Amino acid sequence: MEPDRVGREPQYDLFADEFLDHAADGFYNAHYDRPACLDLLGDVRGKQVLDAACGPGLYAAELVSRGAQVTGFDASPRMVEICRERVPDAEFLVHDLADPLDWLPDGSVDVALCALAIEHVDDRVAALSELRRVLKPGGALVLSRMHPTGDWLRHGGSYFDVRVIRERWNKGWDVTYWLAPLEVTCREIYEAGFLIERLTEPRPVPGAADLNAAEYERLAREPRGFLAFRLLKR
């Protein structure tokens, strides 16, 4: 029987150290998701950036190097420990994306980033609404998530069903997330108070072909990977 909720367990805490090693130069993270999101973030010099569900701080480190003032949070205590060790010039807190950001005042952040995390939240509109609340007028949220077409091709059933998926990744990591059609994600974005400025279906950067030529060719022609959005507070 499929689960009907993702729940609140910090899934990545169990493999936080392994995930750092995997994501630092891994195909999907370093050569696919991060380049796309960093492009959408644009120039962050001097800006207050909120890194929501920051993982091991790979984005935070890059944003600090580009001149941003970064605050990050993650539900995994071990991920936050890793962040504090690796990125001492940023601030990090243990906090669940599903909870209100009650430690941040309204309109206190220039830009927010939420990379490959929103699908692990049961009430995505509430989480996105909180990110909107803390953005300054005209602020932007860069959001990435798994491409629903790729997940649907893997799991079958109706593309239009909204359902919880539990799967084991190739490193033996068990993860649970929401699979929903693109129209549902777009509706949730609008209900949370955002407009879509840009939507990209990223392709891997050219150097990724040296890591995995077959996967590079597949993602260069098929929508099986991620989506990335730049959203404006309305």
Model-derived segments and spans:
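Short alpha-helix
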Residues: 176-199
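Class I SAM-dependent methyltransferase SAM/SAH-binding core
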Residues: 48-52, 56-100
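A short acidic, Gly/Pro-enriched loop at the edge of an enzyme's catalytic core
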Residues: 102-112
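A short glycine-rich, Lys/Arg-flanked "PGG" loop and its adjoining helix->strand segment in the class I
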Residues: 125-140
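Conserved class I S-adenosyl-L-methionine
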Residues: 1-45, 58, 62, 79-82, 140-168, ...
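C-terminal lobe and adjacent flexible extensions of AdoMet/dcAdoMet transferase-like proteins
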Residues: 192-205, 211-234
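A short SAM/SAH-binding and catalytic strip from SAM-dependent methyltransferases
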Residues: 111-124
